[in-house]
Amino acid sequence: MKTSLRYILLSLCLFISCLIYGQGTESYVHGIVTDAKSGEPLMSVSCRTYDKNGKLLTFGISDVDGKYMLRLSANCSYAEFKSIGYKGHRISVASLHDNSDVTLERDAVALQEVTVNIKPIEVHKDTINYNIAAFKDVNDKKLVDVLKKLPGIEVDEAGRVTYKGNSINSFNIEGQSLLGNRYNQATNSLPIDAVAQVQVMEHDQPIRALRGKVLSDKATLNIKLKSDYKAKMFGELSAGGGYGDEALWNVDGTAVRIARKNQLLATLQTNNTGNNLNEYAKEHIDVTDIDGYEPIPNNKLTTERRTFLPIDEKRFTFNKSISAGLNHSHLVGKYGNFRSNIVFYGNRINDSDSLVNKYGGSSPVMLHEMDQSTFKDWVLAPIFHYEHNAPHVFLIEELTTSFGKQTNNGVINSNYVGIDSKTNARSITVQNKLQMTLTLGKQILQVNSFVRYYCNQEKLFSDDISDNPIYNLDERLLSKRLVARNSVSTIFNVWGNELRLKYALEYRNNGLRIQQDRYDKYFYVKNSFSPEYTIKYSRGFVYVALPLNALSSRMQWLPHSKNNRFYLTPSLRWSHHFNSQWRSMLSAGVTDDIAGEDPFSSFYFSNYRTKVSGLDNLGRNLSKSLSASLNYTNIISLFSWNMMVTSSWQKRDFYNSYTYDNQWSKIDPIWENVRSNRLLALTSVEKTWSKIRLFTKATVNFNHSEQPFIQNTVEYKVKSNILSTSLSLSWTKLSWLQIYNDATFNLSWQNNEQFKSSNSLRSYYNTFRLQVHPVKKLNFGISANNNIIETEPSKYHSLTFVDASCSYIISKRIELTGKVTNLFNQTKYIEGYYSGINYFYYERPLRGIEGLFSISVNF
């Protein structure tokens, strides 16, 4: 095995070396394109190279100063320069090497016949400018509506933006990061009429002190506003009312002011129309930023069951919600910036559902639960951020706090036993981040500090109102977590490449108190020393890291629980650009983390019937992963293709045993090595035909996992598979008619080795939307959403939602809108799904037919 591994590593090194050496067959040429008569530089000139057969090899576009850069491959025959209003100019490669400056002559005939159209995309070196007017149609209202159409850019349901499959460095408005990682406030609130361009700066190094010294493979998004919207207040206020099962309201307000030194974005939303607003308080976390990423733990006591459904959340959420955000940024001196981001949201949700649990195995158990509850929560989350970004000094100081409360009061009918259940949670989080970078000649010094304190008090009360009560509980938990993660690193230039030496110290002090019993605390200290080497070449880079870790832990309640261990967590990342269109990424690594919940000495009830026993030590999760991605983006033809494959193999030293009977559910840890694996494959294709205004996107996802578990003392191994395909189309060529369609097909199946059984379920979702403009200011819209869900093999449940809308633009600033949703008055959602050897049948009521009338005012 070791010999095979050596051969694999040797082959990989030889392949990379050959690839790097092979770059010598290509060269670059720089020059300036000017007007032959006036000598003025020409911008946006199309510069392309071809082989002898006329096949396009590379392309570029001249910048505002007429400068261009072209890569000349070995089989390049000639280059061609074209611009509207000018005669095309073809030049051989040999001539281009002798004189790289190019002049274009005006074409008098072309000037008479030319029709001025907005170019969808302009390229200036590593900056790609998407002109919004070329992608926007009359139905787009907010920035997010157009972002989803831009080639290479993806926006998920939570508003997180990725570019070519990678998270972005920063989301800026006119060069400033007003919102930090809460930028979905801008994507969902910024009026699209105010936006001129979306700039994507590829390979952007946002830290000035590291530019030209440390490579960045991520992009920065910058929103450019129209000149009429700069340095003045603008925004939108809409208010609406209507009726369904109760009186309805919806208020949405946005105020924006973007000036050179100051930026302001204020939002206010409130509704009872099903729009849950809690996403605005969440940050989009980059999990590749290990030093600055620490997930917030979930509540241990909860009565919630099914929170995600594959239909629009507005269909089943009976809410009263409010959200307010105040974001301000101010430049301090030449290189400083101070911003404050304050978000508040509150929710009240009336919920009811029914769940049939069929726990399989050697002793099957049937549990039928019906729940009616009122869930309330609120969160206040301010952030104060100072940044100094000078050529030799970079500093970030960020203070984040969060205060929240959640309550859930309900009545549960469990196998015909009535139970009053209440949960209550109060949490506080205080977090501080410090980042500093200094350049001392050729040497770079970096310091990072992350400190977070988290405290959560939880209560669970259940009152069994039957004749023979067994579910009377009064559970109280107090969780506290303190984590401090500090690191110092220095960067040297070794053999023309970057060598980073990094030392990190992580300290954790976590504790849990159950009832008024002992406060169970555990501590751990991890020291890490990591040499990291980056080999850069003209087409990409290879990154290798070999961290050595020393972990020491101790359980306070166990006198001889001290544990020390040393381990390596190597990683490899290879990014390669075959040309300006093709890009690949390969990564592999080993992680060795703590697994499971915090250890504690006793047990608690997480709900009225589930008993959770604690771990008496820290669990360990050893994971090996391999990931590969390939991306093709052609900004001339507006075509992009992505493919990603990720595989992981995990080994844990414990896993949970689940026990179900008619009265209780129990979760007990078992100290035994267990292995699992997962495979994820994803591919997507996007194509925009700008002349006919047709946008298409197709995706295919496949997820496979193998997971062993123990249920009712019997060990099982289940193989789960999910295949999902989707196709989106939009056609907006005609000014009076637009057509949209989104279709999704899901297939899930599971194989159980113990029972030699296999289960499969299918689902299909399709949304068709039609917008008609009989006159310029009048718009009619209708949408039909059809859902076909297989609840059991060969048994299907179908839902069809039909919505209609009408809007009339009174003036440039005022618009009236009327909407009717769920015209067929669908009242119940039904779903069946498998989890391991268990089957669940779920029902939930839906919002009925509703009408809403609103008025919107732009200012």
Predicted regions and their residues:
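Short Pro-Gly-centered beta-turn/loop motif in secreted/extracellular proteins
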Residues: 42-43, 69-77
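Short, acidic Ser/Thr/Gly-rich low-complexity loop/linker segments typical of extracellular
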Residues: 53-67
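Conserved C-terminal beta-signal and adjacent last beta-strands/turns
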Residues: 724-747, 755-859
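Membrane-proximal, glycine/serine-rich, low-complexity loop/turn segments characteristic
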Residues: 23-26, 36, 65-69, 80, ...
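Outer-membrane beta-barrel translocator domains and adjoining extracellular loop/strand segments
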Residues: 211-213, 277-283, 350-366, 399, ...
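Short, ordered, surface-exposed loop/turn motifs in non-cytosolic proteins
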Residues: 37-51
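Face-selective signature of the C-terminal outer-membrane beta-barrel domain
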Residues: 329-347, 374-412, 418-558, 567-570, ...
